[in-house]
Amino acid sequence: MMVHMEVSWLRVLLDNISSYLSLSSMDDLSSNPAHKYYTRGEDIGKLIKPVLENLIDSDAAPSELLNNGFEELAQYVDELREQFQSWQPLSTRIFYVLRIESLASKLRESSLEVFQLLKHCEQHLPADLISPSFEECIELVKLVARDEISYTIDQALKDQKKGVGPTSEVLVKIAESTGLRSNQEILVEGVVLTNMKEDAELTDNDTEAEYLDGLISLTTQMHEYLSDIKQAQLRCPVRVPSDFRCSLSLELMTDPVIVASGQTFERVFIQKWIDMGLMVCPKTRQALSHTTLTPNFIVRAFLASWCETNNVYPPDPLELIHSSEPFPLLVESVRASSSENGHSESLDAEELRQVFSRSASAPGIVSEVVCKTKRNNNAAADRSLTRSNTPWKFPEERHWRHPGIIPATVRETGSSSSIETEVKKLIDDLKSSSLDTQREATARIRILARNSTDNRIVIARCEAIPSLVSLLYSTDERIQADAVTCLLNLSINDNNKSLIAESGAIVPLIHVLKTGYLEEAKANSAATLFSLSVIEEYKTEIGEAGAIEPLVDLLGSGSLSGKKDAATALFNLSIHHENKTKVIEAGAVRYLVELMDPAFGMVEKAVVVLANLATVREGKIAIGEEGGIPVLVEVVELGSARGKENATAALLQLCTHSPKFCNNVIREGVIPPLVALTKSGTARGKEKAQNLLKYFKAHRQSNQRRG
């Protein structure tokens, strides 16, 4: 049943969904190997978001059971968002996709549970709470595809052990599903997996090492099969000797060079490989002791002679390097096979998207699509449920950094004692005089702190925080960035917030904010200051320490991620009255008005800060001078429900006791959208709109009396 109680997890879930949906503005999202899982999460998010908004606006609040459901779903949404934001091109794609797929599956099941709980409470809710009904929402979530590449990989590994596979069709499916669409990506994956396997062997983790060995074999077969396909495509009267073909380009070489491992590659391709920070031989997967490229005159001479004899003209490597090589393994036949078996995801996705876009106005459309696709999805669901369970856990993905790799396997699990032992060793490494040692230690702690609450507690208990704080002044850009991110991850734990602040982190964090080497470091410094400012006493301390001006600078000139983190921090700091004037004097209003352009995807963040600043005289003046009134009116008319609410609150503050602003706002045509808001806005939005309209009426009557 529904009772009146705090709805904190409901709001957290709504905020998390909004943050997740905002990922659609990321430039590199479409190239993410797990993009299709983002789309599935987006479909669920767009379905549940209006339900949550209406639930917040209603008089009913969730029961404890439902609040628990919101909490679980909020955590899955946030974890999924973090995974998409943390994607790095030079990390293992297979494990990344498997992790995303696992979270996407949990998200789907958790959202089903939430809708089922809401359905049980439906009689306690207003009749017009949502459209379509909860039953229809349940059916829509069930339509979200749940085919699993993890099942395909498990089967491929089993077939591999039996010596009967995998088939080319299976290789294609794995490659396409994990974003391994070029020979270079396949080779990178093999190198990353090999490094992870070596780390597993060092820790005597035989189960993990065996699993990784199977995946390495799969990537090797992908490379070999792609090589065979490429050989068949070469228009040569005779077969091209393998020694004349570059393992990276799969083409005839024109400028063969030797690397430190003794292997020969086409110069421009191996140079690109090294320039990416891959200090490992693509063929042998050995570490390269140096980057010198030695011309292989012998191979060049033999190659020239062979080409002349066989009348073959090698392609221009400079043209090849700028073109991407797709993975051409029978793609059409695989898609045709999937379609025959009822797994044509593109059709399901298209139909489902139509339902999501039309369901609010035409709920009857749901049953039509449900009936049409339920049988097909059941087949996929049945097969996915039969996949074998394995006790092995995903290792954390590996991130590559120039000039080498970080040789630390990241686990998601581990006993508290083993983690504590490792953390103590890492803390000693943080104090090392070797930058390489410090770099590896901060990178490892960063991952540990991100992975679990228990890890964050252990890291803080082992007194890692003071050492991390001191590294904020490091002259090594990677160490500094990872140290900041470690503190950000640790600050998720409320007790750690105080430990971080009491370790003197505020001033060093501001130092990074001002002078950080990487945009990532500046953005995460802003995010950490926001996290600390949740505690009331630190709002004043952060403001007095000089954080506001660099936060405003980041708001104006930082990356999009940095702008968002700066806006969030400024919002929290501006709640404290003494900080409002500092934010205004630092020039934040101009940037906030600029960021209300929908192209930035920051309208809601900018508006809520302006609403805070509009409560003081200096803020009102600045908003008026910087052209904030027209954009606030535009948000009232065209913004999201939350955006309209906060824009109206800001306009109400501007107009109160200011006939000049009142006239300006009216001239911008705000009255029609305000009237509409009184009928369809959030509860607070309706209240603010009604108050503003009343104020306009009183203002008009006052003018008439004076006239």
Curated annotation (Swiss-Prot):
Domain U-box: 239-313
ARM repeat ranges per the UniProt record: 453-492, 494-534, 536-575, 577-615, 617-656
Catalyzed reactions per annotation: S-ubiquitinyl-[E2 ubiquitin-conjugating enzyme]-L-cysteine + [acceptor protein]-L-lysine = [E2 ubiquitin-conjugating enzyme]-L-cysteine + N(6)-ubiquitinyl-[acceptor protein]-L-lysine
PROSITE patterns the UniProt entry points to: ARM_REPEAT (PS50176), U_BOX (PS51698)
Annotated GO biological process: protein ubiquitination
E.C. number(s) listed in UniProt: 2.3.2.27
Enzyme superclass (EC): transferase
InterPro entries: ARM-like, ARM-type_fold, Armadillo, RING-Ubox_PUB, Ubox_domain, Znf_RING/FYVE/PHD
Molecular function, one GO term: ubiquitin-protein transferase activity
Keywords, comma-separated and alphabetical: Repeat, Transferase, Ubl conjugation pathway
Pathway: Protein modification; protein ubiquitination
SUPFAM superfamilies according to UniProt: ARM repeat (SSF48371), RING/U-box (SSF57850)
SMART domains: ARM (SM00185), Ubox (SM00504)
Gene3D superfamilies associated with the record: Leucine-rich Repeat Variant, Zinc/RING finger domain, C3HC4 (zinc finger)
Purpose of the protein: Functions as an E3 ubiquitin ligase.
PANTHER family the record matches: U BOX DOMAIN-CONTAINING, U-BOX DOMAIN-CONTAINING PROTEIN 2
Protein name stated in the entry: U-box domain-containing protein 2
Record organism: Arabidopsis thaliana
Gene coding for it: PUB2
